[in-house]
Regions:
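Short beta-strand segments enriched in hydrophobic/aromatic residues
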Residues: 32, 91-93, 108, 124
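Short, surface-exposed coil-to-beta transition loops
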Residues: 71-73, 101-108
Length: 137
């Protein structure tokens, strides 16, 4: 992937994350491919695969019900070529009813199709995502 394409992936992910943080999942959906495949980590307690925009809405609703506050922060994007990249994403929030802070760094392997996020494979660590992508730090 050229620097131009890496910048495109980073820009698209920033748009999705910023829309989600400001206005919720529905604001992010126009930037999500209609045939999205979102693969949760194997350790995930809910469904392991979410499909399409409705699937992403289901995931956001299910996960979001655990928090009074929740946001994503895109920290880093690494080129994988062929419209794919690894993203380091920090999840931050306050657990519902307790006020206790939660922070967790996760890795996403992301693929864009027609400028939209079409696939996300989620890993519970940056290192696991890099390993799955055949990279290491």
């Amino acid at each position: 992937m050229s620097q131009e394409n890496l910048d495109l992936v980073r820009t698209r992910l920033n748009i999705v994350v910023e829309a989600f943080n400001a206005r919720g999942v529905d604001a992010a959906l126009p930037h999500i491919h209609p045939e999205l495949v979102w693969n949760a980590p194997p350790e995930w307690l809910e469904s392991d695969v979410y499909r399409g925009r409705e699937g992403l809405r289901e995931l956001a609703t299910s996960w979001g019900q655990n928090f009074d506050e929740y946001r994503l922060d895109l920290e880093r994007v690494v080129d994988l070529g062929d419209g794919r990249a690894v993203a380091l994403v920090h999840q931050r929030g306050r657990l519902k009813g307790t006020g206790h802070p939660m922070e967790m760094a996760v890795g996403w392997i992301v693929e864009l199709v027609d400028g939209q996020v079409a696939r996300v494979d989620v890993y519970f660590s940056w290192e696991a995502a890099l390993d799955a992508a055949g990279l290491s730090e």
